[in-house]
């Protein structure tokens, strides 16, 4: 389930069986943990789908916490909806609550630009930690 450039992807409904493969084979994955009984989740669903159409290179994944309770537990989901962004297999963002379309779009753009190997000043993390150890 690797995203292909130029190919519009529908929102993927993930389960315990396919979630790890999706998260492990894509650079960035945006996840919406939700439940059918959750009013805010149902209101956020169309926003999630709408924004997903703007990013053909990023999979947007929905996980129903009642259908995949072990996955929700492993992800430490305490409230729904919860939006999570995974980059290179690491969770780089998690927030309970729905987002506005512009905020979700900004979040995806920030995730695409985020480089976990750089610090806030743009220096390589390995370089900055090496220079700190030089004085010892």
Where are these regions (language model features)?
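Non-catalytic, surface beta->alpha helical segment in thiol-disulfide oxidoreductase systems
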Residues: 87-117
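A short beta-strand-turn-helix
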Residues: 11-28, 69
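Short pre-active-site segment immediately N-terminal to redox-active cysteine/selenocysteine motifs
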Residues: 27, 34-37, 79
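Short acidic DE-rich linear segments
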Residues: 118-136
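Conserved helix-turn-beta segment immediately C-terminal to the redox Cys motif
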Residues: 26-30, 43-63, 69
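Short, Lys/Arg-enriched N-terminal segments with co-localized hydrophobic residues
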Residues: 1-8
């Amino acid at each position: 389930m690797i995203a292909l450039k130029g190919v519009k992807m529908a929102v993927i409904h993930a389960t315990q069986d396919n979630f790890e493969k999706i998260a492990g084979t894509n650079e960035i994955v945006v996840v919406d943990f939700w439940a059918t009984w959750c009013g805010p989740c149902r209101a956020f669903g169309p926003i999630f789908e709408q924004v997903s159409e703007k990013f053909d290179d990023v999979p947007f994944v929905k996980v129903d916490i009642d259908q995949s309770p072990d996955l929700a537990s492993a992800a430490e989901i305490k409230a729904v909806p919860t939006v999570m962004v995974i980059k290179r297999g690491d969770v780089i963002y998690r927030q309970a609550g729905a987002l506005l379309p512009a905020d979700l779009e900004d979040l995806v753009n920030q995730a695409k630009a985020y480089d976990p190997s750089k610090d806030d000043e743009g220096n390589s993390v390995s370089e900055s930690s090496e220079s700190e150890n030089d004085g010892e």
